[in-house]
Amino acid sequence: MKTLLLTLVVLTIVCLDLGHTRICLNQQSSEPQTTETCPNGEDTCYNKTWNTHRGSRTDRGCGCPKVKPGINLRCCKTDKCNQ
């Protein structure tokens, strides 16, 4: 009986993927690719792009921030989806 209970607990943890955290890219513009592990409960990555007098700029990270008009924002929910 204890073995059955333990098996059910392990199966539940595996199936629910408890504790999984999202991994997002977090480099800016043309910097080398880096990643960050998002805080628990944060399951979204973002990629925002805007134009400046120096050209197009890109910022990436965890979450899905509100942006001002003129900034293109793309949010997604898989690891490293914010290319």
From Swiss-Prot:
Q: Would the keyword DNA damage turn up in this protein's UniProt record?
A: no
Instruction: Identify the domain of life.
Output: Eukaryota
Provide an example Pfam family for this protein. Answer: Toxin_cobra-type
Signal peptide, first to last residue: 1-21
Gene Ontology molecular function, alphabetical: acetylcholine receptor inhibitor activity; ion channel regulator activity; toxin activity
Q: Its principal location?
A: secreted
What GO CC terms are in its UniProt record? Answer: extracellular region
List S-S links within the chain: 24-45, 38-62, 64-75, 76-81
Name the organs or tissues of expression: Expressed by the venom gland.
Which keywords annotate this record? Answer: Acetylcholine receptor inhibiting toxin, Disulfide bond, Ion channel impairing toxin, Neurotoxin, Postsynaptic neurotoxin, Secreted, Signal, Toxin
Is Transit peptide one of the keywords UniProt gives this record? no
- State the compartments where it is located: Secreted
**Family per record:** Belongs to the three-finger toxin family. Short-chain subfamily. Type I alpha-neurotoxin sub-subfamily.
Query: What the protein does?
Result: Binds to muscle nicotinic acetylcholine receptor (nAChR) and inhibit acetylcholine from binding to the receptor, thereby impairing neuromuscular transmission.
> What is this protein's record name?
Neurotoxin 3FTx-RI
